[in-house]
UniProtKB/Swiss-Prot annotation:
Cited HAMAP family: UPF0178 (MF_00489)
InterPro entries: UPF0178
Pfam family, one: DUF188
Protein name (Swiss-Prot/TrEMBL): UPF0178 protein Pmen_0294
NCBIfam families: PRK00124.1
UniProt organism field: Ectopseudomonas mendocina (strain ymp) (Pseudomonas mendocina)
Family per similarity comment: Belongs to the UPF0178 family.
Length: 149
């Protein structure tokens, strides 16, 4: 089994959590980034730096991840592409992307993009919290168990 991480947008605490699970359960972790990021020094962790460009890391993830694997990403359009391909997708705050919720997740993302462009809302997500880390660990455990069956 393999877990892919969109490393450009994934909080370090979530990446570290995936590595912890990988060491316990014996799977490979592949960090995909548009620029060099810190790679934990374990044999189970691989770093792929893709050429810079719009959506280069996303395209690499969609091209190489296969059903039965998991991708950690915050990007809703990327998650939609992965789910359509049959690849499991989870955001770093513990929310799984699937066929049942993709339409709603895309609509909310598009609404907030439009509101930001019109200057009606500002800022971004709240800082990554202990509650987020715990929700992520629980969801990660649940999905890995499901995928290993």
């Amino acid at each position: 089994m393999r877990v892919w991480i969109d490393a450009d947008a994934c909080p370090r605490a979530a990446r570290d959590q995936v590595v912890k699970f990988a060491l316990k359960r014996g799977f490979e972790v592949v960090l995909v980034a548009g620029q060099a990021v810190a790679r934990p020094n374990f044999a189970c962790v691989k770093l792929i730096v893709v050429p810079s460009g719009p959506d280069a890391a996303d395209d690499h993830l969609v091209e190489h991840a296969v059903p039965g694997e998991l991708v950690i990403c915050s990007d809703v359009p990327l998650a939609d592409r992965l789910v359509k391909k049959g690849v499991a997708a989870l955001d770093p705050r513990g929310r799984e992307f699937d066929e049942r919720n993709m339409g709603e997740r895309l609509a909310v993302r598009n609404l907030f993009t439009d509101l930001r462009e019109q200057g009606q809302v500002g800022g971004g997500q709240a800082p990554y919290s202990e509650k987020d880390r715990q929700a992520f660990a629980n969801a990660l455990d649940r999905i890995l168990t499901r995928l290993s069956r």
